[in-house]
Curated annotation (Swiss-Prot):
Localisation: Cytoplasm
Predominant location: cytoplasm
Stated name of the protein: Exodeoxyribonuclease 7 large subunit
GO cellular component: cytoplasm; exodeoxyribonuclease VII complex
Family assignment from sequence similarity: Belongs to the XseA family.
Keyword Transit peptide in record: no
Catalyzed reaction equations: Exonucleolytic cleavage in either 5'- to 3'- or 3'- to 5'-direction to yield nucleoside 5'-phosphates
Keyword terms: Cytoplasm, Exonuclease, Hydrolase, Nuclease
Superkingdom field: Bacteria
CDD domains, per database record: ExoVII_LU_OBF (cd04489)
Role of this protein: Bidirectionally degrades single-stranded DNA into large acid-insoluble oligonucleotides, which are then degraded further into small acid-soluble oligonucleotides.
Originating gene: xseA
Length: 446
């Protein structure tokens, strides 16, 4: 009698066979991705060819390490193991490693990461920083023993001696290189005495240069506060670091030239030209000042200083004339008054009154005489005082006595409060004048 197996028993048997079969423990398989829809964790899809289909699974940890994203219709080569899923009685391949078929995985990864970062805007020109014209200290992230650092040091020393080079010895290829490059870029940005950063290495295969295509390095360059020059490989080599850097140089020598756009010779030439321009400007200023001084010395005021007080002398003459006229008028008026009073007394005729009025008249006459004398003396003294005051205004008399007169913009300076530092003043002396600049102003404490 035949023995019938349960579905479970058969499935378990088949699973045991699959698990123990050495040919199914590590299977090398090629196929086309089908029914793929990217999930946040594990990836489930199908691998097919023209005649068959097999279910495939990639656990999330493995998928994150692939270095590229699966796409519908992509042909891939995978390594994995075949297993049976008992509840459905189906079998599938659990993929442990995968790479695109034909085109290398690195090329796919390059294009996919480039597309991703481009969409994020990391390569846009608006984020590029201008390189400094004069750098005091330049940081270099590269290998300690490579030709890169030697070429940079030689070129910078030739173009602008005195610029410091600070090397960050860095692993530039192989496992851990990308992390070390990113870490040293961040370290350089922590310093306040760096002006610029050069990252790079010499030529090599795409695998050798791959650290400069890693996302961690690209983002470190993008986040750099310091302007970054990328010099990776030869002129024909292109990395993602070149896209995100502020400038790309084909060689380390070219990078050093970009880092020192102005040479020491350029600076010396510029200084010499500036010196010539300043000398010409000084000569022009002196010429204009000398011409202005010549015009001033030829002015009427300097040639005929007495004209400064001509008006005051005329005023003095007028005052003296008015004073004399006033005195004569007053004397005449008083005489007329005396005559009128005398006439009144004569007309009244009483002897006593006449005598009294005569006495009174005599007193008034004396008083009038004394008052007129006082008034006259006062007017004469005032006229003398005004005359002396006018003479004091004569600058030629002042400087003739050994004094000097300070003038600012044609006005006489009578107080330090009207001056300030760097004011231009003229010192008038007996035998000429001196142009001065105020060095300091000190007010006398009272």
């Amino acid at each position: 009698m035949e023995k019938y197996l349960s579905v479970t028993t058969l499935t378990k048997y088949l699973k045991m066979k699959f698990d123990k079969d050495p040919y199914l423990e590590r299977v090398y398989l090629t196929g086309q991705v089908s029914n793929f829809r990217k999930r946040p964790t594990h990836q489930y899809f199908s691998l097919k060819d023209d005649h068959a289909v097999i279910q495939a699974t990639i656990w999330s940890g493995i998928y994150q390490k692939l270095g590229f994203d699966l796409e519908e219709g992509m042909k891939i080569n995978v390594i994995g193991r075949v297993q049976v899923y008992e509840p459905s009685g189906s079998y599938s391949i659990i993929i442990e490693k995968a790479e695109p078929d034909g085109v290398g995985a690195l090329a796919i990864q390059f294009e996919q990461l480039k597309k991703k970062l481009t969409e994020e805007g990391l390569f846009q020109e608006r984020f590029k920083q201008a390189l400094p014209q004069f750098s005091k200290r330049i940081g270099v992230v590269t290998s300690r023993s490579g030709a890169v650092i030697r070429d940079i040091i030689t070129t910078v020393s030739r173009r602008f001696p005195g610029v410091d080079i600070l090397l960050y010895p860095t692993k530039v290829q192989g496992e851990g290189a990308a992390e070390e490059i990113a870490r040293n870029i961040a370290r350089a940005n922590q310093r306040d005495d760096l002006d610029l950063l050069i990252i790079g290495r010499g030529g090599g295969s795409i695998e050798d240069l791959w650290a400069f295509n890693e996302e961690i390095v690209v983002r470190a360059i993008f986040e750099s506060r310091l302007p970054v020059i990328s010099s990776v490989g030869h002129e024909t080599d292109v990395t993602l670091a070149d896209f995100v850097a502020d400038r790309r140089a084909a060689t380390p020598t070219a990078a050093a030239e970009l880092a020192t756009p102005v040479t020491k010779l350029d600076v010396l030439t510029h200084l010499q030209n500036q010196e010539k321009r300043m000398a010409t400007a000084v000569r022009n200023v002196l010429s204009k000042k000398q011409e202005a001084l010549k015009k001033c010395s030829q002015s009427v005021i300097f040639r005929q200083p007495e004209r400064l007080y001509d008006g005051y002398l005329q005023r003095l003459d007028q005052l003296q004339l008015r004073l004399k006229q006033s005195l004569r008028t007053r004397i005449s008026d008083n005489k007329q008054l005396v005559q009128a009073r005398t006439h009144q007394l004569v007309q009244l005729s009483p002897v006593t009154k006449i005598q009294r009025y005569q006495d009174r008249l005599g007193q008034l006459d004396k008083l009038l005489g004394s008052q007129m004398a006082l008034v006259y003396d006062a007017k004469v003294a005032e006229a003398k005082r005004l005359s002396e005051a006018l003479l004091m205004l004569d600058t030629s008399r002042i400087v003739a006595r050994g004094y000097a007169i300070v003038k600012k913009e044609e006005s006489i300076v009578d107080s330090v409060e009207s001056l300030k530092k760097k004011d231009q003043v003229t010192l008038l002396m007996r035998d000429g004048q001196v142009e001065l600049e105020v060095k300091d102003v000190k007010t006398k404490e009272i």
